[in-house]
UniProtKB/Swiss-Prot annotation:
The protein, known as: Deoxyuridine 5'-triphosphate nucleotidohydrolase
CDD domains for the chain: trimeric_dUTPase
One GO molecular-function entry: dUTP diphosphatase activity
Metabolic or biological pathway: Pyrimidine metabolism; dUMP biosynthesis; dUMP from dCTP (dUTP route): step 2/2
UniProt keyword list: Hydrolase, Magnesium, Metal-binding, Nucleotide metabolism
Family annotation (InterPro entries): dUTPase, dUTPase-like, dUTPase-like_sf, dUTPase_trimeric
Recorded name of the encoding gene: dut
Functional summary from the UniProt entry: This enzyme is involved in nucleotide metabolism: it produces dUMP, the immediate precursor of thymidine nucleotides and it decreases the intracellular concentration of dUTP so that uracil cannot be incorporated into DNA.
Catalytic activity: dUTP + H2O = dUMP + diphosphate + H(+)
Family of the protein in this entry: Belongs to the dUTPase family.
Species of origin: Rhizorhabdus wittichii (strain DSM 6014 / CCUG 31198 / JCM 15750 / NBRC 105917 / EY 4224 / RW1)
Amino acid sequence: MSSPEISIKLKRLDHGAGLPLPAYATAHAAGLDVVSAEDVTLAPGARHAVATGFAIAIPEGYEVQVRPRSGLALKHGVTCLNTPGTIDADYRGEVKVILANLGSEPFEVKRGERIAQLVPAAVQRAAFAEVSDLDETARGAGGFGSTGR
């Protein structure tokens, strides 16, 4: 069963001319591939907010998550920081992807190269209720590997 498709408005910026719009690579892909609108070289250990050449208007009640591409991470040590990054429904600036080179060699990002995936997701709002005590659980305060490696 698939979720209903939502419509996201996209404004192409001047430096995004000629680039493909975000698109699914396969029929069952969860993320839309997004490409770079600029050439940039990432030195080992460097990071850069890579331009995509577009801005979007996400419907209220949704966000768009920015996620890394597994091939870039495995083959080159290049990944997205702040993952998943969240693009809020009220943001109207250019979508940028924070890439980091965790590898040992410089990595060249070419204009038009796929750099990340965008995954639209419904947002569940919450309100915190301050209490004096929390209910007990078997796990308790254990975290950061307390349930295994």
